[in-house]
From Swiss-Prot:
GO terms for cellular component: cytosol; nucleus. It is found in: Cytoplasm; Nucleus. It comes from Schizosaccharomyces pombe (strain 972 / ATCC 24843). Keywords: Cytoplasm, Nucleus. The keyword Cytoplasm applies. It comes from the Eukaryota. Residues 167-178 have a biased composition (Acidic residues). The keyword Cytoplasm applies. This is Uncharacterized protein C191.01. Its main location: cytoplasm. Residues 98-109 have a biased composition (Low complexity). Residues 89-115, 136-178 are annotated as: Disordered.
Length: 178
């Protein structure tokens, strides 16, 4: 008789990130490699949309950086910035110094871009990425935690939450018209 062990108890440290997102990857590079294999077409679409150099940056982040090296919130924010083509802090500083004749970018804050002003194809890719890595809807009645960090604030809400919000706006408009 052959015995097989069906499961192993593994301790996974979860890192707090924006409400609605859960990335419980114990070994992020290995799990991202598995996700890339299972979602090959999606990852090709990302490469074709964002350019080869940016895709190479993402692959390095996804496949080589552990949770100890890059916390979950930073992992998501960096992925989002690259996928949506937000300029990095270094690029922003270079752009500001070129336009204002300044050489220091340490005192200026990065410009926040709204999701409505971005390329819909890139927004769609970002949302697909979030679905690939997993969303966990917040528990109703959840207690308020400490205010989110700037890295957590930069991560957009769940597409499900955005859809629910837009549906309720449409219903309100219909009620007003009636």
């Amino acid at each position: 008789m052959v015995t097989r062990r069906l499961s192993t108890n593994v301790h996974i440290d979860l890192q707090p990130i924006r409400q609605g997102i859960l990335l419980p990857f114990h070994d992020r590079p290995a799990e991202m490699r598995d996700l890339a294999k299972c979602n090959d077409q999606f990852f090709r679409n990302v490469r074709d949309t964002i350019s080869e150099p940016k895709f190479t940056q993402l692959m390095e982040l996804w496949l080589e950086k552990s949770r100890a090296e890059v916390p979950d919130a930073d992992f998501l924010m960096t992925t989002r910035n690259i996928m949506l083509s937000f300029p990095s802090n270094e690029e922003q500083g270079h752009q500001r110094s070129a336009s204002h004749g300044s050489t220091s970018s340490a005192t200026s804050t990065p410009k926040r871009l709204s999701i409505s002003s971005m390329d819909p194809a890139r927004i769609h890719l970002w949302r697909q990425f979030c679905n690939v890595v997993g969303y966990d809807m917040p528990t109703p009645g959840e207690q308020k935690e400490a205010p989110p960090s700037p890295a957590q604030e930069a991560i957009p809400e769940s597409p499900v939450e955005e859809a629910i919000a837009s549906d309720s706006d449409e219903e309100e408009e219909e009620e007003i018209k009636a």
